[in-house]
Regions:
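Bacterial N-terminal signal peptides that target proteins for export
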Residues: 1-8
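Hydrophobic helical h-region of N-terminal Sec-dependent signal peptides
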Residues: 8-15
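Glycine-centered structural positions embedded in regular secondary structure
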Residues: 13, 82-83, 232
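N-terminal signal peptide c-region/cleavage motif recognized by signal peptidases
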Residues: 17-19
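Hydrophobic targeting/anchoring helices
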Residues: 22-130, 139
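Helical hinge/lid and interdomain linker segments adjacent to catalytic or ligand-binding clefts
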Residues: 25-35, 65-75, 125-233, 237-239
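Oxidoreductase and adenylate-handling cofactor-binding alpha/beta cores
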Residues: 239-246
């Protein structure tokens, strides 16, 4: 009886040990909990690219990420200077139960695939115009720069996600006309836009930009994701709405 009791004790001890061991890695994203937020996004992308599933915990500690516990994930976090916390199954289940409570304004979104990212940016861009590529580069998230030639040759089909920022799809040469139209860089930018439109077979920049906007619209209709910011948000819709109107 004593031997059986001892065996039972050992089994229970092992089960408790297994249930409390580390099984997940949490990347906290609140301001005070994460020392490098951009690199944390990069770790998440890297994990997805390695075929790990990641849970995005919306509204939980700044939108934290929950990854499987693996030696290579811990090592990569340490190399990139990303704050991480090691959680047991029990602790993880407690967090997920709290998030799923109807009384909480939180949600768990499972991420399964690393998207192929394209950034729409001109070849002759100015450094201050391209914070997006600077951020992605620092975060170590891979991306491809594309512009009108690539869009019009249907290369958007190669990507899952398209990012737009400083672009005037109406063909009016951007919002800087009022203050910078006499500066050398703006004059060169305008000349480059006109030369590209002519090269692609269009008489006017506005016609060429409308064709680009239509290709992007079709990309979104076909299931592609687009994130637009700055002048791209308004000018994209205006260009499509103004088709047939010389603005």
């Amino acid at each position: 009886m004593k031997i059986k009791g001892l065996n039972l004790y050992i089994i229970l001890f092992l089960l408790c040990s297994l249930s409390s061991r580390a099984s997940f890695v949490l990347l906290p994203m609140e301001a005070e909990g994460q020392q490098n937020h951009l690199k944390a996004y990069g770790i998440t992308y890297w994990a997805l690219d390695k075929s790990y599933k990641v849970s995005w915990l919306l509204n939980y500690r700044g939108g934290s990420f929950l990854l499987p516990d693996a030696p290579e994930i811990r090592k990569e976090c340490q190399i990139r200077g990303v704050t991480f916390e090691v959680l047991s199954d029990a602790a993880t289940n407690s967090i997920l139960e709290d998030i799923s409570s109807p009384s909480q304004n939180m949600e768990t979104v499972v991420l399964e695939k690393a998207p192929k990212i394209a950034v729409y940016t001109p070849k002759g861009k100015q450094p201050w115009d391209d914070a997006v590529t600077m951020v992605l580069t620092y975060a170590e998230i891979p991306y491809t720069e594309i512009y009108d030639e690539e869009v019009l040759s249907d290369q958007l089909l190669l990507y899952d996600w398209l990012h737009l920022h400083h672009e005037d799809f109406t063909g009016q040469y951007g919002k800087f006309f009022g203050n910078y139209r006499s500066t050398p860089w703006y004059i060169q930018q305008k000349a480059d836009a006109e030369a590209l439109a002519k090269k692609l077979g269009y008489n006017k920049v506005s016609e060429e930009k409308l064709a680009v906007a239509k290709k992007i619209r079709d990309f979104v209709i076909g299931g592609g994701f687009m994130f637009a910011m700055c002048s791209a948000t308004d000018s994209f819709d205006i260009a499509l709405s103004a088709e047939g109107v010389d603005i």
